[in-house]
C-alpha cells in the first residue's frame, strides 16, 4: 500500500478515515523501481475456479495479501441442499448419494433453463442458444471477471423458477467465508483456508518483481500454489490495471457524514489510457451496534452480565472481529449513530476510546474490518470469546450491495430502485458515472439545485450525499495505479 507520507497528503485533499495515523515512517531501503505502493487486485479463472488476489504493496514489497475464490461451474452455482429438494430441482444419483441442482438459474437477471442429460448425471444451463458454462469460460478481461466475482459475492446468482424468482436455495459461498465448508481444515489437512493463509504469509516481505516464493518453505500443500503466486504477482506489478481502496464512508471536516459508521470498498478497473473502465462500490451495513443486536432466541443464550440494553433493544456485550475481542458499553449520547461503544485495550490502545475510530484510522484497519464483515468473521461471543451467534443479519448479509440486504429498501414503487433498494439504485448511478473519467484531472463533485451530483461535467443522476464521498475514495484508489 502507499506510503504513509502519500496517505497523509491524500487525506488532506479528500478523506481517509477519521483518526490519527501515527508516526510517518521512512523506508529502510529504496523501493523497487517501477513498483508503486498501493492496493491492487487481479482475477483469474482456472479449472472452474474464479480467484481474486488483493495485494497491499508498501516500500516496493508485499505488506499483506488476501485471496478469495468461488466455484463457477453452472451446476455448482445451481446446487441445492437435500432439505431443499422439491419439484424445482433435479435429483442426481451419485456414488455417495443424491445431489440436487435447481432447474433454473437466475444469473444476474438472466434466467437460464437447465436440462438433465439422458444418463441423469449432467445438467446443462442455456438461455436460448447461450450455454452458461461456455459464456463463463469465455470471460478473460479483468473487469469481466471482477463483475462475475462481485455478482457472486453479492448473491445475484441463484436457483429460481422459470420467471427468475428466487427460491431461497443454497447460494454459492466465497471459499474465504467463515460459512464455507469447501475443503475444510482439519487435523493433518490444511484445506483451502489453511493453504491460502500459508501462501498469504509467504508473500509478505517479497518484491514480486524479482523474488520467488518457495512452496516447500511456505508450508502450503495445494497443487494450485503457483496459480495463486502468479495472480499475486500480476496484482503486485499492476499488470491487471485494477486497484481497490477501503475507508470509512466520510469526508474529513464535512458537516454531514451520514454513513460515517460504515466502511466502504471501492474497486476500480482502468484501461491502458488510465481512464476508468468499471467501478464496484460496496459498504458495510452500519457498525458494531447492528452486529451486536440479539434476537430473542439469541438473548436467551447469554447471561444478564453478557448483555446490554438500550431502550427495548438487547445487544451482546462482546463481539469478536476477525478473532479480536471487543467489549461494549452503552453510550450516554449516540456516537455517529452508534448506541454502543466497543473497545479493546490491547488493539485500540489509549489513543482510541471507540473501535469505530480505531478501524477508521488507517487503510489497513478499514480493510480488515470490511473483510471481517463481508466474510462473516464478526460474531457475538461470551467474555472468553466463545462464539454464540453470528454478527450478521438473520439473512446472513453484512454489506449493502448484497441481494437480500434491506438497507434503504423501498417496496411500494414510489421511487426508482434496484432490487427494491434506493441505495443500490444510487450506487449503480455513481458506478456508471465514474466510467470514462480520467482522475488525473481536477474533477470535483458538485450538487445542483435538484440535489443531483455531478462529477465534473458528468451528471451521476444520484442524489445521495455519499456520491461526493465515493469520488474522493476513487481518487485515492486511482493513486494506487502502477
Regions found by a protein language model. Give the residues of each.
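Non-catalytic terminal and connector segments of soluble metabolic enzymes
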Residues: 31-32
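Sec-dependent N-terminal signal peptides
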Residues: 6-13
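Bacterial lipoprotein signal-peptidase II cleavage site
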Residues: 19-27
